[in-house]
């Protein structure tokens, strides 16, 4: 069985993240969505909220394939989380050349530290290429319409978060 790990902060999960997740499910039998926990960052959504949003979004968009997705938290190196959960592939989404430059450096370092773990780059669909969680949060905080950029459950959660 092929297991892939897809790491990020997912604060919040966007249609771009879901696009990468769909691609990962074409490559692997099981995909672990690994939410990085960074002590220096204060996320908008708690870990539990992000898990719930990822799971709800996966069910709504991926239907039966959502059963092949699990969500975990990790701190430290993603390669350690990958090893712990038996992943052979590390999936990374690419929006543009800037992402590629950074991700190539990370893949090189990860490849040196964990040669058994193969990094796979998935280019974002042009329809979601410009979406970032940071921009989504900014638009939502100013009352803008974020529905084109995030799954339905996430749009509702963002609207609730910024109305309170």
Swiss-Prot record:
<comment type="similarity">
    <text>Belongs to the bacterial CoaD family.</text>
</comment>
<feature type="site" description="Transition state stabilizer">
    <location>
        <position position="17"/>
    </location>
</feature>
<feature type="binding site">
    <location>
        <position position="41"/>
    </location>
    <ligand>
        <name>substrate</name>
    </ligand>
</feature>
<dbReference type="InterPro" id="IPR001980">
    <property type="entry name" value="PPAT"/>
</dbReference>
<keyword id="KW-0963">Cytoplasm</keyword>
<keyword id="KW-0548">Nucleotidyltransferase</keyword>
<dbReference type="GO" id="GO:0004595">
    <property type="term" value="F:pantetheine-phosphate adenylyltransferase activity"/>
</dbReference>
<feature type="binding site">
    <location>
        <position position="92"/>
    </location>
    <ligand>
        <name>substrate</name>
    </ligand>
</feature>
<dbReference type="InterPro" id="IPR004821">
    <property type="entry name" value="Cyt_trans-like"/>
</dbReference>
<feature type="binding site">
    <location>
        <position position="103"/>
    </location>
    <ligand>
        <name>ATP</name>
    </ligand>
</feature>
<feature type="binding site">
    <location>
        <begin position="128"/>
        <end position="134"/>
    </location>
    <ligand>
        <name>ATP</name>
    </ligand>
</feature>
<keyword id="KW-0808">Transferase</keyword>
<feature type="binding site">
    <location>
        <begin position="93"/>
        <end position="95"/>
    </location>
    <ligand>
        <name>ATP</name>
    </ligand>
</feature>
<comment type="function">
    <text>Reversibly transfers an adenylyl group from ATP to 4'-phosphopantetheine, yielding dephospho-CoA (dPCoA) and pyrophosphate.</text>
</comment>
<dbReference type="Pfam" id="PF01467">
    <property type="entry name" value="CTP_transf_like"/>
</dbReference>
<keyword id="KW-0460">Magnesium</keyword>
<keyword id="KW-0547">Nucleotide-binding</keyword>
<feature type="binding site">
    <location>
        <position position="9"/>
    </location>
    <ligand>
        <name>substrate</name>
    </ligand>
</feature>
<comment type="subunit">
    <text>Homohexamer.</text>
</comment>
<feature type="binding site">
    <location>
        <position position="78"/>
    </location>
    <ligand>
        <name>substrate</name>
    </ligand>
</feature>
<keyword id="KW-0067">ATP-binding</keyword>
<keyword id="KW-0173">Coenzyme A biosynthesis</keyword>
<feature type="binding site">
    <location>
        <begin position="9"/>
        <end position="10"/>
    </location>
    <ligand>
        <name>ATP</name>
    </ligand>
</feature>
<comment type="pathway">
    <text>Cofactor biosynthesis; coenzyme A biosynthesis; CoA from (R)-pantothenate: step 4/5.</text>
</comment>
<dbReference type="InterPro" id="IPR014729">
    <property type="entry name" value="Rossmann-like_a/b/a_fold"/>
</dbReference>
<dbReference type="GO" id="GO:0005737">
    <property type="term" value="C:cytoplasm"/>
</dbReference>
<dbReference type="GO" id="GO:0015937">
    <property type="term" value="P:coenzyme A biosynthetic process"/>
</dbReference>
<protein>
    <recommendedName>
        <fullName>Phosphopantetheine adenylyltransferase</fullName>
        <ecNumber>2.7.7.3</ecNumber>
    </recommendedName>
</protein>
<feature type="binding site">
    <location>
        <position position="17"/>
    </location>
    <ligand>
        <name>ATP</name>
    </ligand>
</feature>
<dbReference type="GO" id="GO:0005524">
    <property type="term" value="F:ATP binding"/>
</dbReference>
């Amino acid at each position: 069985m092929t297991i892939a790990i897809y790491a990020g902060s997912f604060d919040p999960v966007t249609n771009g993240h879901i696009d990468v997740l769909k691609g990962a499910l074409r490559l692997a039998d099981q995909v672990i969505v690994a939410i990085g926990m960074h002590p220096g960052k204060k996320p908008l959504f708690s870990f539990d909220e992000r898990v719930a949003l990822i799971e709800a979004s996966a069910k709504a968009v991926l239907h039966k394939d959502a059963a092949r997705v699990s969500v975990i938290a990790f701190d430290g190196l993603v390669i350690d989380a990958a090893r712990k959960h038996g992943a052979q592939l590390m999936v990374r989404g690419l929006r543009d050349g800037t992402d590629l430059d950074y991700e190539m450096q990370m893949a090189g370092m990860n490849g040196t530290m964990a040669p058994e773990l193969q990094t796979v780059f998935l280019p974002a669909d042009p329809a979601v290429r410009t979406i970032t969680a940071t921009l989504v949060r900014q638009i939502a905080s100013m009352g803008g319409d974020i529905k084109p950029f995030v799954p339905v459950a996430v749009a509702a959660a963002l609207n609730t978060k910024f109305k309170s």
